[in-house]
Each structure stands twice: as structure tokens, then as C-alpha cells.
Amino acid sequence: MITPSIHLYGRPTGAEPHWKDLTQVAGRSWKRVTHRLYGYLSASFDLSSDNMSESEIIWLYNSAIGCTIRELTAGMTTWEGLIWDMRLIVGGVQYVRTLDSEWTHNKVKAVYSSDIGLRTATAWTENTDASDEYGEMQYIDSMGGATAEGAAALVARRIAEHAWPRSRMTGSVAIGNRSSGVSLQVTCVGYYATLNWRYYTANTTAAASSLISTLVGLSEFVTAGRIETNALSVRANSSDTERQQRIGDLLTHIIEQGDTSGNVWQGGVYAGKKFRYEQAPTDYTYALQRGRLLTRGMSEPAPTMVEPGFLARNLDAPMGYPPHGTDSAWDDPAIGYVEQVEYSTSGGLSVQFLGAEAQMAILQAQIASGSLPRSTNKSTNKMRNA
């Protein structure tokens, strides 16, 4: 089995020089997820004074937020993102640095009610030093009734407080607890997350693939890769003062609409920060047999090379024929659509199917408890790696 390596690079606002090979220390706890709607989605790893010097851990905490992380397999990028959140524990006290948009934003404006039924927007205010270093992170604060002076004051306060991913002490501290040792929890996100650093504030109707290209073109870091033509008419209903929508959210909404023939589409940001948009496959790519994932040639792929958005035939399924009147692989009970792939150095490869059974069970439970559904679980299959 090919073992991946984990590497730290500089920030994407610069030339991204190679900083450090983290394979020996981060590789022990490395875990990452790729999804058919987002591409490279998330990753995480832990460091402690058991496997890295305390000074190096603290240096990473102080220096690496917003830096690029890559998983390489045989020299090829098989996951890529940036360090999003870091949680350092020293002497029992937790310190946090994060790029979460509620905590870090360097370009801000406010939208407020200046009169009954009248929404007004301030001009953008930007800390260019922060955006030059980390990328432009827009934030629109939606207010209630306010004066122009009050809205401007809120914008100024947000820029002063949140333009930089500063370190903050969080949580509780047990007084008298003489904790020793240093640990660091690192959470990474794929570059799809940076698409939500910018808003789209135009009212546009266009073909799906055309609007996808337009939206991706507004990104600071992501560029268009393979964009298949989709003539479905879609709409972005935004304005400067109403219904401001983040670019990433709009892209996901378009992908989920599919096409005029009812086909499933998929997309996301992959290697090289390239955005893909394509129709989901109509035939199976892999087979499942006794916990193993196999190619159609019955060989096992490298676990880190497997990407979501494929059909898999279960060779152990009790039913192997589609219902009468259809020859679509999507209707074959022995074939499932894999929407998410997870790989970890400790657990290997697992795939998650898009399926209605688990969704219905959750929906029934939420109806019974009186709560509204916000998310759904899907069935997960664990792959055994040879």
C-alpha cells in the first residue's frame, strides 16, 4: 500500500514555499474527508510533546494559521487545503486561532434599516495588511434600525477586533492544576471554504455552467478546472442590500439542482485549487466485495487516490437487478452512489453512500421528538485496505 506524506506550505497569498514535512508527526493522526459537493472538504491532525518538541508546536501555532496543507501520494496531490483552526493547550490553558468567519474578517460593511422599509448599506472597510497576508475575507453585518453613524461605528469595531486571526484564551482553567506538556489540535478545510469569503450581490439568471464559471471567477484562490456544459436555467437572487449570498453557498445550490433531465451533478475544488463541475457517472466505477473496494479489473486502488462521486456495484448484494422498465445503473439495487470518501492513517478508507433509508429514519425520529430536521446521516461502508 502506498503511504501518503503530509506537507506544510506557505499561505496562498504568496508563493506557497515548502515549510515542513509533517508526515512523521501529523501522519499518525491524519484524517481527511472529500465530498461530491465540495471536493476536498476537511482534514485534521493532532500534535503533542510526545512526538514533537514544545518549541516547534508553539511555533506552528504562532505561524501556520492560513497556510496550505497537502497530502501527497506518489508525488501527486490527493488532498489540499489550508489550516483553518488551531487549538493549543499549554499548562492546562487553551488558546485558539481560527479563520472562522465570525471571528476573522478583514473587509466589512453593514446593511441596516435607515427608515421603515428602507435598507441601506455602508461602504466596504478593509484592513489591507490583513487581507494581503491571509486573503480577502468579506463580512456583511445585517443590522436592524440604525443611523449611518451607528452602522459605521459597528464596521470600525469589527475591523479593529476581527481583521487578524489573533490568539484567544478560551474555556475554563482549573486553578491549582499543575498540568504539564503541550498539545495542538489542527483543523484544515479545503479551498472550497474560501469561496464563502466573498459575496455575490447581483440578480442574475443564466445557464448553470455559465453562472458556475462566473462565480468561480470571483474567487481569490480557486480557478475553473473542468466545467461541463449544463444549460439548466438557474438564478442568483441577490442585491447590495437584500439577500446577500456567499459564493460557495450559491455554487452548492446550483450543483444540487442537477439538470433538465433529472440527472445528478457534482462539483468541488480539487488539486491545484481547480473547481470541477460535471454530471455524475451513469455506470459503476468500482465494486464492493467482502469489505474491499475494487476496480472493474478487480484490483484494489490506492486508498488516497479514491475520490467521491462514483457508482459502486456491491457484488455481495442480495438483489442484483433493476426494476422493470429501466436500465439505469441508478435504479439497480446492487449499485450505490458514493458521495463522500474519508481516509485516515489509523482507519484506512471508508465511503458514504447517498441513500434515503437513513434519512427517513432520522426524519421519523425528529418528527416524533417535535424537532425540525437540519441534517441527515447516510449509510457508511468501511473499506479494508490490503
Language model regions located:
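Beta-strand-rich assembly/attachment modules of structural machines
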Residues: M1-H105, S113, V173-S209
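Acidic, low-complexity/disordered segments
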Residues: M1-H7, E16-K20, V93-K107, S114, ...
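Short, basic/aromatic beta-hairpin or loop at an interaction surface
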Residues: V33-D46, A280-L294
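C-terminal or late-domain output modules
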Residues: L47, L218-I227, A287, G297-P301, ...
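Charged- and aromatic-enriched interaction segments used to assemble
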Residues: G92-W103, S113-L293
